[in-house]
Amino acid sequence: MNLIQTLEKEQFDKLSAGKTIPEFGPGDTVIVNVKVVEGERSRVQAYEGVCIGRSGGGINESFTVRKISYGEGVERVFPLLSPMIDSIKVVRRGKVRRAKLYYLRNLRGKSARIVEKKQDRTAAVAAAE
């Protein structure tokens, strides 16, 4: 390992020490709880939408979440290890065949829906026990 990789690994371990980051990918609906500072007060705001892509790797990894707010599409890019992210929760898994879902920007209504990924029987039985 060279010096840069060593330093990045140390930073990655330090930043991800207190967090549990779930496994999620493009097509998954996620709720990202973001810390918002307004003046002297801070609060946690939930941002729910579809993950349309992940980019980068290691300490520089980020993901893009798209939601429809009052009929207008809103996208937000979050660094995965940002201290402003309180928590990430996966609401549902989407079945997609692409790594980047930028085509959703051009779709409206029912055509913009993503099919939910079905659990196989063995995983469902294991989860029930």
Swiss-Prot record:
**Gene that specifies this protein:** rplS
Q: What does this protein do?
A: This protein is located at the 30S-50S ribosomal subunit interface and may play a role in the structure and function of the aminoacyl-tRNA binding site.
Q: Which UniProt keywords apply?
A: Ribonucleoprotein, Ribosomal protein
Recorded protein name is Large ribosomal subunit protein bL19
> Does Signal show up as a keyword for this record?
no
Give the record's family classification.
Belongs to the bacterial ribosomal protein bL19 family.
Q: Which GO terms describe its molecular function?
A: structural constituent of ribosome
- The answer, when asked if Secreted is one of the entry's keywords, is no
Q: Which GO biological-process labels does this protein carry? A: translation
> Which HAMAP family does this UniProt record tie to the protein?
Ribosomal_bL19
Name one cellular component (GO) term.
Answer: cytosolic large ribosomal subunit
- The disulfides recorded in the entry are none
